[in-house]
Amino acid sequence: GLWSKIKDAGKAVLKAAGKAALGAVTDAV
């Protein structure tokens, strides 16, 4: 349903944000 699509999209966004944050931290070190 629509709700599961929204949840999946939210998970994908969180994953991408986490990867970006991890990359930024790695670059800063």
From Swiss-Prot:
Q: Which GO terms describe its biological process?
A: defense response
**According to its UniProt record, where is this protein located?**
Secreted
| Tissue specificity field | Expressed by the skin glands.
Matching Pfam families: DD_K
Q: Which UniProt keywords apply?
A: Amphibian defense peptide, Antimicrobial, Secreted
Tell me the superkingdom of the source.
Answer: Eukaryota
What cellular component terms from Gene Ontology apply here? Answer: extracellular region
Coiled-coil-forming residues are: none
Q: What function does this protein fulfil?
A: Has antimicrobial activity.
Q: Into which family does the record put it? A: Belongs to the frog skin active peptide (FSAP) family. Dermaseptin subfamily.
- Which protein are we looking at? Dermaseptin-9TR
